[in-house]
């Protein structure tokens, strides 16, 4: 599948992103880590070696790979991605984020058409916003997850983020004070910006239990994550679990993964 890059009209957001890219090129952000630099180097090598159009698609993780540790994209990465598009390579972001939480540096990048989000549980057309496929957690499994964790929720030891049709929802007490639920200070601004608060998250989950792309359990005490993970997977065979950070346990349908999400495109 070949996509020719078309320039998108600039908005104030695009202008701001462009300025950030220019600053990054002149004065590299000190948070740009070795992992991101290695990614840039490997991406440029792949494009350079793409003789005869052998490479048709590049699937990209986002956080701490395509994006730097502060969530921004370097000028070098942006240039490499645009070069890939111009060389007829389909660029496909694949992320644990929900669709509505994708950064503007990705959504406004010309030439990107499809994105696999919620750890591959959903695939969206980035241009139209239409969901073109995916998996939702079985309603019986949603209820089982709540039954196994709701007591801890009532005690303030865990809380939930749920992704419904590309949008992240969370309990209003958590959105107001993420740090009280184990979220590090560096992630507070992102959490408040992208999570839509509801008064009663458990009732919200039950109301939408047939629509959940993902349930993320946020852990006040990260040391219990592995034990909880094992207990959930043992009791509920219809789910898939993963974790990108120590305070978060991400749950999707058992068939959902970044690889399976890519298979829908």
Give the ranges of each region predicted by the language model.
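Active-site phosphate-binding/coordination module
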Residues: 75-185
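Short helix N-cap motif at coil->helix boundaries in the Bergerat
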Residues: 68-69
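Mg2+-dependent phosphoryl-transfer enzymes with acidic/Ser/Thr/Gly-rich catalytic loops
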Residues: 2, 40-57, 73-74, 234, ...
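Non-catalytic pre-domain segments flanking phosphatase-related domains
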Residues: 1-60
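Conserved acidic, metal-coordinating active-site core of Asp-based
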Residues: 156-265
């Amino acid at each position: 599948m070949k996509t020719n890059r078309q320039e998108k009209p600039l908005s104030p957001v695009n202008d701001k992103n462009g300025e950030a890219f220019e600053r990054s090129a002149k004065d590299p952000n000190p948070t740009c880590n070795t992992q991101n630099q290695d990614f840039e180097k490997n991406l440029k090598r792949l494009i350079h070696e793409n003789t005869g159009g052998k490479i048709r698609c590049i699937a990209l993780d986002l956080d701490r790979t395509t994006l730097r540790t502060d969530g921004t994209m370097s000028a070098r990465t942006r240039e490499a991605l645009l070069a890939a598009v111009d060389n007829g390579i389909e660029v496909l972001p694949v992320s644990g984020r929900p669709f509505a939480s994708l950064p503007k540096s990705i959504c406004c990048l010309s030439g990107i058409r499809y994105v696999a989000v919620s750890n591959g549980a959903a695939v969206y057309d980035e241009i139209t916003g239409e969901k073109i496929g995916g998996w939702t957690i079985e309603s019986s499994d949603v209820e089982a997850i709540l039954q196994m964790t709701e007591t801890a929720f009532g005690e303030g030891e865990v809380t939930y983020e749920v992704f419904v049709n590309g949008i992240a929802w969370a309990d209003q007490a958590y959105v107001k004070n993420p740090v009280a639920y184990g979220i590090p200070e560096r992630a507070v601004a992102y959490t408040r910006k992208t999570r839509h608060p509801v008064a009663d998250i458990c009732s919200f989950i039950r109301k939408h239990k047939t629509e959940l792309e993902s349930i993320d359990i946020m852990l006040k005490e990260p040391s219990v994550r592995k034990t909880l993970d094992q207990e959930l997977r043992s009791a509920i065979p219809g789910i898939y679990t993963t974790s990108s950070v120590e305070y978060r346990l991400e749950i999707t349908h058992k068939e959902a993964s970044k690889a399976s999400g890519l298979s829908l495109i």
